[in-house]
């Protein structure tokens, strides 16, 4: 058993070294584009609840471009007859996970979102796979699944 654990630790170090190599062909996430059925309501949610800022709009598509200092989002308005995403039967984005700075901030978001009829809470804050991370899952006003998660630092 000790050999197995040592082997797994060795392989994970080798793998992480390979992933962190300078010659990797891709970098971090640049932005996410979400199709939304309620552009104004979804934009308001990301701005007023999650702290994003609008840095641009495109009235032709229409779209809103948002940023929170760490990530950018493009919200694209769908046609009126758009079909909702079915995570078990369609290929596509299952959910968007957004970091929250503390457990207290996660609980505060839950309390704020709980009073919003246009936002569906799939589950309240709970430990993720036994911890130490804690998360909750919601559907923003257009129905996109958003995970709000806090992972405490390892210090």
Task: State where each predicted segment sits.
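N-terminal beta-strand motif that seeds the catalytic metal site of vicinal oxygen chelate
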Residues: 20-40, 93-98, 152-155
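Core segments of cupin and vicinal oxygen chelate
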Residues: 35-79, 129
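Short beta->alpha transition motifs characteristic of CBS
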Residues: 76, 129, 149-155
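Mid-chain, structured segments of secreted extracytoplasmic proteins
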Residues: 60, 65-110
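Bacterial N-terminal signal peptides
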Residues: 7-15
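Active-site beta-strand termini and strand-to-loop segments that position acidic
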Residues: 66-69, 138-141, 151
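Positively charged n-region of N-terminal signal peptides that target proteins for export
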Residues: 1-4
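Vicinal oxygen chelate
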Residues: 36-41, 97-142
């Amino acid at each position: 058993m000790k050999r197995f654990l040592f082997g797994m630790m060795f392989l994970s170090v080798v793998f992480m070294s390979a992933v962190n190599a300078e010659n990797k062909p891709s970098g971090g996430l640049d932005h996410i584009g979400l199709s939304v059925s309620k552009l104004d309501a979804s934009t308001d949610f990301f701005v007023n609840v999650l702290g994003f800022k609008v840095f641009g709009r495109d009235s032709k598509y229409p779209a809103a471009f948002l940023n929170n200092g760490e990530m950018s989002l493009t919200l694209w308005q769908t046609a009126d007859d758009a079909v909702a995403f079915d995570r078990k039967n369609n290929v596509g984005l299952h959910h968007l996970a957004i970091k929250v700075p503390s457990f207290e901030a996660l609980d505060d978001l839950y309390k704020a979102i709980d009073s919003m009829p246009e936002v569906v809470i799939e589950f309240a804050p709970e430990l993720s796979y036994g911890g130490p991370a804690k998360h909750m899952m919601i559907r923003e006003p257009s129905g996109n699944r958003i995970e709000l998660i806090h992972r405490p630092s390892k210090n």
